[in-house]
Structure formats: C-alpha cells, structure tokens
Amino acid sequence: MKKLLLLLVAFPLLISAQQNTVCFTVDPNQNSTTAFSGFTKYVDVLGCFSIYAESTITDAKVLHAAAVAAELLDNNEDGIVDDPLIEVQLISESALMPIFFQDGNAAMNTFANNYNGNGVSAILYNGEIDPTQTGHWGDDATVEEVIHTINHVGHTNVYPAAFSMQANSSLMSSAMDVARGGQFMSVPNNYPASAWYHYDDQTCDYECMMIEYMYWAIVSYMGILNDPQTAQGISDEWE
C-alpha cells in the first residue's frame, strides 16, 4: 500500500483555489481531421496533453483547463513533466481534453462519431468550468476530468501492478474492494455499512468505479474536499 500511495500522490498536489498565472496561449485549431472540425481553439500543454475547445468557450476557461493539466503533470513547475514514463504514454496516445459548449451539440456529435483513438477518457462542458474555484465540488469539474484522463490514459497503462483496472489485478483494485466493503462487479442494491466508497451509478462498471476511486483518493490527499459543505455534498458517494 505504501508504494501505491507514493505513486498516487507524486503528481497532483499544488493546485490552488484559483489559478493566478497562466503561461499558455490559445492557438487556432490546426487539426483538420473530421473529428476535430468543431473546435476552433487549441492549447498544447507541455508537449504531451492537448486542450481542444469550441469557439463559444472563453479563452479564460480554455486556459484554466490547460493550467490544471500543467499543474498535475508538472508539480514543481519547472516546465518538465514530473514522470517521464507518463509523458511518453500521453504522447503515444495523443491525450487530450475536449471542451464542448453543451451536451449533444453538433461539435460533440461530430467528435463522438469520428474520433478513433485512445487519448480521451473524459470531456468538459462550458457550464462545468469555473476558473475562480479550481476543483471545488459542484462548481468546477476541471480537476476531476483532467485527472480521469491522465489516470486512465497514463497511470493504468504505465503502472499496471499498481493501477490495472481489472478485478484482483492491482494494488488499486484491492484497495477499492476494501473501500466498497467487498468486491462488486456491478453496483449492489446496498453497500455494506463498512464501505466508505459507495458510488451508485448503475451505468458505471468495475473499471469505471476504479477511475472514480482513483480521483477521490487523489483529491482527498490534495485537500480539495476539506470543507463541511463539500463533505456533506459528496457523502452519498465518498466519506
């Protein structure tokens, strides 16, 4: 478990409540493939993570997503991705975060119907981004969705002994089974009283539960959840 904890906390600890300085620029989208035709804005984050956004997304929100990704990948802010193995993996899969104005619009449908890669694990919508409340539950989903992408595209592949998403395959799967009060391949009708992770989305399979568990573990360590309002709001899923 000590090795698992070290791997988990090695990359995401310095995000502040508000991004004060952003050292990126929003460039025009140069990706001409059909899947990306709905995006006009692009940011390259440290050469290994891309942000694509529609024209209706403000530059401030696009830059916020880029800053969050940079903080997670380069915690000491020296301009170099902290984990070179994660960097290589993200590059190999062309990891990215697409930002859509709303669910089901033309840009989203075009992307969903034409994207054929392994670099996407989550998406963001305009209404989920608040640069003034970084990662705050119910206000800004940027930290959550970027963490999901880095974990899913990066960590689960680079460190399978720690983070493989199959049951009985990794330190993380064993830890999650304890947190859920047992091993459940689908969502149980009721979680045991001993469980402190009890996500009840019936559409979320075991691997999905793993990705969510990794997020909760990381942001708990980061301290993002350390206020009474947040603790109360998430108690149905995480204690």
Protein language model features and the residues they cover:
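Pan-zinc metallopeptidase signature
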Residues: 207, 211-239
